[in-house]
Amino acid sequence: MEKEKNVEINTIPKLFWNSVKSRADRVAMREKDLGIWQEISWTVYGEKAKLTGLALHTLGLKKDDVVSIASEGMPEWLYTDMGTIGAGGISSGIYTTDSAEQVKYLVNDSSTKFYFAENEEQLDKILEVRSECPTLKQIIVFDMEGLNEFHDDQVISYEEFLKIGEKANLEKPDLWESLINNVNSSD
């Protein structure tokens, strides 16, 4: 991997972003869809992570705020993880097998501000306990299957969430790299 000139790569976000730029169209990961492996490039990985980080920042994520992810391993999990870290937040995984009571404990113990749910099953758990989670600001759902008629001011789809990041990127094209550069190796 070729290091970008004049950039000290001393944090995970900087290493990630350097990889995105230097590896561009190379395969970053693969996901099986209906039995067929789909390739995801570093460019796509980077863009989704960037939009995620920008959306989190726009919605009020501050340095060291916690973002919890209740999902099986999937590309969206990785986009959210890198977007969170790049925006200065802390990423926290929640097992999909955890009960609603366990989710409540984890969300409260970590002071989670943003909660990503893989699907309706994971959404139901956080909805059951959210009134007892005072720090929770926003719930984002990756897969809205079965939720087309569902409306709640605290819940948005990942697709809608990414549009917030797209708008932020258009308004402030240098914001993402600024956020990455504000993350320190001591964080």
Regions found by a protein language model. Give the residues of each.
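Domain-wide signal for the mature, well-folded portions of proteins, strongly enriched
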Residues: R30-K32, I69, L136, V141, ...
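Short hydrophobic/charged patches on amphipathic alpha-helices used for structural packing
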Residues: W17, G53, V103-K104, E177-I180
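AMP-dependent adenylate-forming
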Residues: L15-I40, G146-L147
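Structural core segment of the AMP-binding/adenylate-forming
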Residues: G86-I164
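Conserved pre-ATP/AMP-binding loop-to-beta segment of ANL
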Residues: A24-D25, V155-I156, K163-D187
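Conserved AMP-binding/adenylate-forming core of the ANL superfamily
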Residues: A28-M82, S99-K104, Q154-L162
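Flexible, non-catalytic linker and terminal segments flanking ANL/adenylate-forming cores
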Residues: M1-I12
